[in-house]
Amino acid sequence: MARGDKVHINLVVIGHVDSGKSTTTGHLIYKCGGIDKRVIEKFEKESAEQGKGSFKYAWVLDKLKAERERGITIDISLWKFETAKYHFTIIDAPGHRDFIKNMITGTSQADVAILMIASPQGEFEAGISKDGQTREHALLAFTLGVKQMIVCLNKMDEKTVNFSEERYQEIKKELSDYLKKVGYKPDTIPFIPISGFNGDNMLERSTNAPWYKGPILVEALDALEPPKRPVDKPLRLPLQDVYKIGGIGTVPVGRVETGVIKPGMSIQFAPNKVIAECKSVEMHHEQLPEAVPGDNVGFNIKGVSVKDIRRGNVASDAKNDPAKEAATFYSQVIIMNHPGQIQAGYTPVLDCHTAHIACKFETIHDKIDRRTGKSQEENPKFIKNGDAALVTLIPTKALCVEVFQEYPPLGRYAVRDMKQTVAVGVIKKVEKKDK
């Protein structure tokens, strides 16, 4: 398909474990996607042989996940599907244990989130409880600037639910109240009763829920606002990997977050100030005259060794607001998952775009109200779970970050400690290291 045909939208699927994310996603890809029929037949046969019939769609996704984890060559078209109006890419495999980290550093910004809810008694309640993932994922999506959301009330076919309008209304009300607290406007969000396994209200209107008059999933997807891509901003391209390719040379790989990259440009890398000329740009083994935000590309540079640049560095245009190393940065942080108290001096690892670097909480300036941003306490001694605060951080090693308002993907981060995401942050000011 030519690049110009349909607008491209990045989709993230969030929600509690076992809410049916994989089954529903698998079903969508299966019915509207680029999966080769032969591949599906092979998966179906294996699925039946292993007695996994009921997981047919999730099984498709599991096989894709396994292929994705084996190497970078997996055919990314497998994660795409099309509707009448848009071309969708699913940008993270739900259920992945690093899902929260991936959502933040994610190789891309999601334009829309599908929040998957399990409707059966007890399952919805577990997901929305204090330690359920529904709340955490919704809060994350909003904090990270995913403004559009579609809610799917899944497993409506389960016998305790049986497409009950009463159960639908009960869940819709409780979820609306929570989403409003987070910052979403529930009246702009479709709440769709579906069965991810049977396909009710996904691509065709179900006769099982005649009381439901809203959009079905495919209609809600087509009704999304097309995302604005920041083509006119200066280039920022965080490196995911750097390869040395015989006969070609050094090839950094990453996703264009803002601006454009094209052959002939003088590329400056931060934080290490290496400058090199971009010789060529390619995507899916095709040479491009230029790459724009959202494109995952490799580009060839001359005169720079693989040792000089690495994952976590940021490529920019040497002649247009080049990226620089950050000396300190000031940000709003939300503590989500920390067992104790966080005080000045705390030095966890930050995952920001593709960088993974320890940073010190130098000063905790204010504890603030998450929704209004107003100060609740100045210079608090410590902050704990559920708190939002304004803090100054100092990287322990060279790091390039940006202000969230200017370069969103380089201005949000996950705080990692004890193998989990303990906090998320959004950068408000950056003190750059000069020359």
From Swiss-Prot:
- Keywords annotated in UniProt: Cytoplasm, Elongation factor, GTP-binding, Nucleotide-binding, Protein biosynthesis
Chain intervals for the UniProt region annotation (G3): 92-95
Location of the region described as G2 in the Swiss-Prot/TrEMBL record:
71-75
- Provide one Gene Ontology cellular component: cytoplasm
User: What is a single Pfam family found in this protein's UniProt entry?
Assistant: GTP_EFTU_D2
Determine if Cytoplasm is one of this entry's keywords. Answer: yes
**tr-type G domain location:** 6-231
Membrane-spanning segments: none
Q: Which organism is it from?
A: Tetrahymena pyriformis
Single Gene Ontology MF annotation: translation elongation factor activity
**Where is this protein localized, as stated in its record?**
Cytoplasm
Report the family membership: Belongs to the TRAFAC class translation factor GTPase superfamily. Classic translation factor GTPase family. EF-Tu/EF-1A subfamily.
Q: Name the source's superkingdom.
A: Eukaryota
Provide the function of this protein. Answer: This protein promotes the GTP-dependent binding of aminoacyl-tRNA to the A-site of ribosomes during protein biosynthesis.
- Using the UniProt annotation, give all residue ranges assigned to the region (G4): 154-157
Please state what the protein is called. Answer: Elongation factor 1-alpha
Region of interest (G1), residue spans: 15-22
Region named G5: 195-197
Return the InterPro entries for the record.
EFTu-like_2, G_TR_CS, GTP-eEF1A_C, P-loop_NTPase, T_Tr_GTP-bd_dom, TRAFAC_GTPase_members, Transl_B-barrel_sf, Transl_elong_EF1A/Init_IF2_C
Enumerate the residues binding GTP. Answer: 15-22, 92-96, 154-157
PROSITE patterns in UniProt: G_TR_1 (PS00301), G_TR_2 (PS51722)
